[in-house]
């Protein structure tokens, strides 16, 4: 019984960590991955969820571009890969009723991966990922109370980049030979 409580506490603490906290630890390569270009965009019919604050296409594109550049420009593998990111929908939590109704922010986006050397699209179809704002002590109040709209956008974009990295690490694409020619 005690180990279950300890394990639950450990999971809770892990969920409370920042999406950029791992920047402080040693970088573990993703095979031969090196970021080529990021092509962020927001769907022409970007879906704003119910009871959400409003965010523009431009705000999402800028936040996603910055978060993905920060996360993926750290990798210096031997082959370039390009990431296409499309924001499809979001909910930016408004203030709710603390503890009783604490709305969560959500981001839905799709990712495609293109290998630079061959020009081949590695994803058969765009891979959809949904991120929900991280669990924090302040989540009991709801991020609508504790975070500005801009902070919510940036936090979701950082979580999107982290979720994409986690997904990329499970793919077999980055085990081939290096293709970058150093002159």
Whereabouts are the PLM-identified features?
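Sec-dependent bacterial lipoprotein signal peptides
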Residues: 1-17
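A structural "domain/chain start" motif
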Residues: 16-62, 173-183
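C-terminal/domain-edge helix-coil "capping" segments
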Residues: 17, 140-183
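N-terminal, post-signal-peptide region of Sec/Tat-exported proteins
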Residues: 53-78
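Sec-exported extracytoplasmic/periplasmic mature domains
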Residues: 69-73, 77, 92, 161, ...
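Surface-exposed short loop/turn segments
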Residues: 75-123, 134-146
